[in-house]
A protein has these predicted regions:
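Short Gly/Ser/Thr-biased coil->beta-strand turn/linker motifs
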Residues: 2-7, 12-68, 75-79, 92-101, ...
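Residues at alpha-helix boundaries and short interhelical turns
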Residues: 70-71, 88
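Short beta-strand micro-motifs enriched in acidic
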Residues: 83-87
Length: 142
């Protein structure tokens, strides 16, 4: 395996549209290590969409989990997406969205918003343990 220190793409006609890494073992395909001794978050991986016209509900980035089915077809079994909920300066809100294959169709199963967790499209909540609800909480059933 190459021991690269840097990958540099430069020049007016140099474009890297897709970087593909292939690993024939179950070892890490990508390992990002920080040796910083401080308490700040590290290492950091950033997915940035630099849109000239950002809008509410825009997707910002996505992590896809792919595999193959029994017909040897590539399938996106699940994905995690970042979205803009509110783009207004000073009141920005974001969403983390979870999608899974459900009966053969891509289905949004959960959204984590700034003020709530939504379980969608007949996704159930199952808890192995206790759910503690504070005395001053309002619980609506049905």
């Amino acid at each position: 395996m190459p021991n690269w220190k840097k990958v540099i793409v430069s020049g007016s006609d140099a474009h890297l549209n897709t970087l593909e890494l292939t690993n024939t073992t179950t070892n890490d395909s990508i390992l990002v290590t920080s040796t910083d001794a401080g308490s700040s978050a590290a290492p950091v991986i950033t997915l940035k969409r630099n849109s000239g016209s950002p809008a509410d509900s825009d997707y910002l980035g996505q992590i896809k989990f792919k595999g193959e089915n029994d017909a040897d077809q590539e399938v996106v079994y699940s994905k995690i997406s970042g979205k803009i909920q509110d783009k207004a300066d000073g009141t920005e809100d974001g969403i983390i969205e979870f999608s899974n294959i459900k009966n053969g169709a891509a289905t949004i199963t959960a959204r984590l918003k700034s003020d709530k967790l939504e379980l969608l499209n007949s996704t159930s909540l199952e808890v192995a343990g206790n759910i503690d609800i504070p005395d001053d909480a309002i619980l609506n059933i049905g």
